[in-house]
A protein has these predicted regions:
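Mixed-charge (Asp/Glu-Lys/Arg
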Residues: 1-109
Length: 109
């Protein structure tokens, strides 16, 4: 399960995580991680192509509702629209590509 792999990656890097009891019907939150003094909600998506802009926009709305920061972690490609939403957001970061590999690779920084 991709969600569990992400949480294990954060733990391997020394961060405290909060797991969901289930990953289906999770309301868009696939787990949580505490980084410094902030709680981040995690959205995990496995894509082959470009990530859906709608998913990024919905996650941003969810973060506003929860007044929380968030990490949108995915295996696909980040299109211009999704990048723009992430850059404009004060709450959300997208983790993909090399950053995702570094997170999932024990011993990397």
């Amino acid at each position: 399960m991709f969600e569990e792999l992400l949480l294990e990656g954060f733990e391997a890097h020394g961060f405290r995580t909060i797991r969901n009891k289930r990953y289906t019907g999770d309301g868009g939150i696939d787990g949580q991680v505490i980084i410094g003094k902030y709680r981040y909600l995690i959205q995990a998506k496995r894509y082959r192509g470009h990530i859906a802009l709608q998913h990024v926009q919905e996650f941003e709305k969810l973060l506003k509702r929860h007044n929380c920061r968030g990490l949108f972690c995915h295996t696909g490609k980040t299109g211009a629209g999704s990048k723009s939403v992430s850059i404009a957001s004060e709450r959300m970061e997208i983790i993909s590509g090399q950053r995702l590999i570094d997170l999932l690779t024990p011993g990397s920084s």
